[in-house]
């Protein structure tokens, strides 16, 4: 029961530094089952007694709740010059699980509703731990730890969350916090060991800062000073009081005992130190901006996407997927890329068209690399051929599902009241107003009460059906001349790209894509600044003519060229093979006879007699 092994998980930074390793405790199966049974029994009571200041370790709550409210506050303050400046105080506890005092944590759990002998059992399970570290050379010697909260154990996160929640309750009752739209108090938002204090700039910010310092000291916790920041939110920062906030700092020194060989770790109080001021800060994976600029987070997503795309293609190329290549590529796109760049996308406020396009271009860049096509390929065709819906519709879906989540919260919950205030006192670009526009655009004629009443699965079904119809129409409306010959009834991957019985290589699939979308390197497909181009036979050249031209291939072809635009893979392959042979003969002929375009492009200039073309097509030179 009291045996545990530590497995290290690398964090950001050098792998050579011990401080960049996080230790996760792995406990015995018997202990895990017992603690899980206790947790399942006591969680409802604990959750009921926790405040909305803490979203960590709670069911149906998470990062997006806090990000949504913080972005809402920033958006509201930036909506008018008349709004009072707000100061965000961002705090992070250093190695909180190592610092938690077990007896204090259990006292807070008792206040949260656990008052029977379960408390004694939790205490005995954590009073003394015999731990060892998993290393490349095996387990280390076991050492005894006393009165610890195990990170990775069933009760670890909830014990930490309840401790921070107790600080949040003190802050709420102090009255130092901010009131959203001058009505709803929002003083502190936490997610396990990450906190954001929210006050008006000035003396209230100093009062809140002092209170958090005192309550943190009472819990024997320590701040990670480098991660603590303050952010002033206002239209005009001139003449706004913004003195430095301070937190307690502790310094750690290691002393080696030469006689015993032991290393002693000593912590020394270093006093109050200033925390840095910033205009943008990463909080729970989302880049906050003091001006409410969505591009700060979008640019971070664009940078992040570079290595994700490289990682995806590295996997695709190493797995030798053959006919499963494109299908797996789209799966990786959804699972690895989209899930990363659209993280917390439902919490954006006033997202502009240009900002949406910046997010969509990330995926479009991936699709261009997947098909190995140039920037001239129509964007709509990338989506339609791959069976992929643009990111804007995924954002709408996430936003409306989050709307459903908020509406299903208890009426007294903070996030529910937060949203209701947006409906009652709307400002331009409010999240609530955006949701109503989404419902109208997707032609979902439901009131908020009806959305609240319907089941989640039914609402998802309505959303998916509506998005599929609207996304298809949106992409069709964006089409130009290229790809217009292809008929799409729904958004799904084209038949020639999915596994089939035809012997098609990956390059062959890409070539069919370029044929269907007129991206083959033929002058008529790129007509800008070019005069009309004729084939060597004197007829106006286009892709269909190259396919049928007898001067390139004397064999009579019965398969219509237009079958390349159909869903019949067998006919598509027949057209592709004939066209590929003809285009290669044509290119070789042009190269050997040094044909030049009249406009210095790749158009065919009529210089040699037609007889030479006839002879060339029959193998005579």
Language model regions located:
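Long, charge-rich boundary regions
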Residues: 564-619
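Short, conserved micro-motifs composed of acidic
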Residues: 137, 224-279
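Non-catalytic, peripheral interaction segments enriched in hydrophobic/basic residues
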Residues: 191-193, 224-229, 233-235, 240, ...
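Conserved pre-catalytic core of RNA-dependent polymerases
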Residues: 1-166
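Catalytic palm active-site di-aspartate
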Residues: 3-6, 22, 70, 86-96, ...
């Amino acid at each position: 029961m009291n045996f545990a092994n530590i497995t290290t998980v690398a964090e950001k930074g050098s792998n050579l530094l011990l401080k960049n390793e996080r230790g996760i405790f792995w406990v015995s199966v018997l202990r895990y089952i017992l603690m899980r049974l206790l947790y399942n029994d006591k969680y409802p009571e604990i959750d009921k007694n926790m405040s909305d200041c803490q979203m960590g370790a709670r069911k149906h709550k998470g990062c997006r709740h806090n990000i949504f409210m913080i972005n809402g506050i920033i958006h509201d303050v930036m909506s008018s010059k008349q709004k009072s400046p707000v100061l965000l105080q961002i705090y992070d506890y250093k190695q909180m699980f190592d610092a938690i005092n077990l007896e204090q944590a259990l006292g807070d759990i008792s206040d949260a509703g656990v008052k029977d002998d379960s408390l004694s059992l939790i205490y005995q399970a954590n009073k003394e731990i015999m731990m060892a570290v998993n290393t490349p050379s095996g387990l280390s010697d076991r050492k005894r730890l006393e009165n610890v909260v195990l990170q990775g154990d069933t009760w670890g996160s909830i014990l930490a969350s309840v401790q921070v929640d107790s600080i949040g309750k003190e802050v709420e009752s102090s009255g130092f916090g901010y009131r959203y739209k001058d009505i709803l108090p929002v003083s502190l938002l936490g997610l396990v060991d990450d906190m954001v204090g929210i006050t008006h700039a000035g003396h209230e910010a100093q009062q809140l800062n002092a209170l958090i310092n005192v309550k943190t000291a009472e819990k024997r916790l320590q701040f990670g000073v480098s991660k603590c920041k303050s952010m002033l939110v206002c239209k005009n920062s001139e003449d706004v009081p913004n003195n430095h906030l301070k937190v307690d700092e502790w310094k750690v020194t290691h002393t080696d005992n030469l006689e015993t060989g032991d290393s002693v770790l000593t912590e020394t109080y270093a006093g109050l130190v200033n925390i840095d001021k910033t205009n943008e800060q990463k909080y729970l994976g989302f880049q906050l901006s003091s001006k409410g600029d969505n591009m700060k987070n979008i640019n971070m997503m664009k940078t992040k996407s570079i290595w994700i795309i490289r990682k995806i293609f590295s996997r695709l190329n190493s797995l030798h997927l053959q006919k499963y290549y494109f299908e797996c590529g789209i799966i990786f796109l959804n699972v690895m890329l989209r899930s990363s760049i659209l993280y917390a996308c439902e919490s954006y406020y006033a997202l502009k068209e240009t900002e949406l396009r910046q997010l969509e271009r990330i995926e479009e860049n991936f699709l261009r690399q997947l098909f190995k096509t140039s920037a001239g390929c129509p964007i709509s065709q990338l989506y339609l051929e791959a069976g992929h819906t643009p990111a804007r519709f995924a954002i709408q879906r996430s936003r409306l599902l989050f709307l459903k989540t908020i509406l299903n919260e208890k009426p007294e919950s903070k996030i529910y009241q937060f949203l209701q205030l947006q409906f009652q006192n709307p400002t331009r670009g409010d999240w609530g107003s955006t949701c109503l526009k989404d419902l109208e655009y997707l032609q979902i004629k439901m009131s908020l009460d009806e959305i609240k009443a319907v089941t989640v699965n039914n609402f998802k079904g309505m959303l998916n059906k509506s998005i599929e119809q609207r996304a298809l129409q949106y992409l069709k409306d964006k089409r130009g001349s290229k790809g217009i010959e292809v008929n799409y009834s729904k958004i799904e991957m084209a038949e020639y790209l999915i596994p089939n019985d035809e012997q098609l290589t990956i390059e062959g699939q890409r070539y069919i894509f370029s044929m269907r979308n007129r991206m083959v390197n033929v002058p008529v497909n790129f007509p800008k600044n070019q005069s009309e181009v004729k084939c060597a036979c004197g007829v106006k050249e286009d892709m269909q003519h190259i396919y049928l031209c007898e001067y390139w291939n004397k064999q009579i072809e019965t398969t219509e060229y237009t079958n390349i635009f159909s869903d019949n893979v067998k006919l598509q392959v027949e057209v592709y093979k004939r066209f590929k042979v003809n285009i290669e003969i044509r290119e070789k002929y042009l190269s050997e006879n040094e044909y030049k375009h009249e406009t210095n492009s790749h158009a065919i200039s009529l210089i040699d007699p037609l007889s030479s073309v006839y002879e060339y097509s029959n193998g005579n030179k």
